[in-house]
Curated annotation (Swiss-Prot):
Designated name of the protein: UPF0266 membrane protein YPO1755/y2554/YP_1637
Source species: Yersinia pestis
Main location: membrane
Cellular localisation: Cell inner membrane
Bilayer-spanning residue ranges: 6-26, 45-65, 67-87
Keyword Membrane: yes
Similarity comment: family membership: Belongs to the UPF0266 family.
Membrane topology type: Multi-pass membrane protein
This protein's record includes keyword Transmembrane helix: yes
InterPro entries in UniProt: DUF986 (IPR009328)
Record keywords: Cell inner membrane, Cell membrane, Membrane, Transmembrane, Transmembrane helix
Domain of life: Bacteria
One CC-aspect GO term: plasma membrane
């Protein structure tokens, strides 16, 4: 196994661990999920460029009669990248004591203010940063609002 193959295996493993964490483990952490909201996807073009570059590497490897293992690993990397960017939905998970946004748990006590912009972006101000949350469906903003009203403490 070459160094290139080893690097590809490491990247594929890291991406798979991230996908498993995002899809399964995050749902089980910090208690029961009270509300799950799908967010708008970002960086579609970036992934398309990444997969295109991997396609070029696959083509070069095949034309240069490179190792078949490298080709399979590149195809695997492309498939994982497509899954993470196009099949999996980014989500906002509300728990009893806080919520997961961008794979980070944020406690409700850190929220200083919440606003809704004119174009349907939920703005949550924390102590030191501002979260701009774009939901997939605008109806989900009402679900979030109702969730906060019901669970206000």
């Amino acid at each position: 196994m070459s160094v290139t193959d080893l690097v590809l295996v490491v990247f594929i493993a890291l991406l798979l661990i991230y996908a498993i964490y995002d899809e399964f483990i995050m749902n089980m952490m910090k208690g029961k999920t009270r509300l799950q909201v799908h967010l708008k996807r970002k960086n579609k073009l970036d992934c398309m460029i990444f997969v295109g570059l991997i396609g070029i590497l696959i083509y070069n490897n095949v034309m240069a009669h490179g190792a078949p293992l490298t080709t399979y690993l590149l195809v695997g990397l492309a498939l994982v990248a497509v899954y993470i960017s196009y099949i999996r939905w980014p989500k906002l998970l509300f728990k009893n004591t806080g919520f997961f946004y961008a794979n980070t748990f944020i406690e409700y006590s850190r929220i200083k203010s919440m606003n809704l912009s004119e174009d349907g972006i939920l703005v949550i101000d924390l102590e030191q940063r501002r979260l701009l949350i774009q939901v997939k469906k605008l109806d989900d903003l009402e679900k979030i609002y109702n969730f906060f009203i019901e669970n206000q403490s």
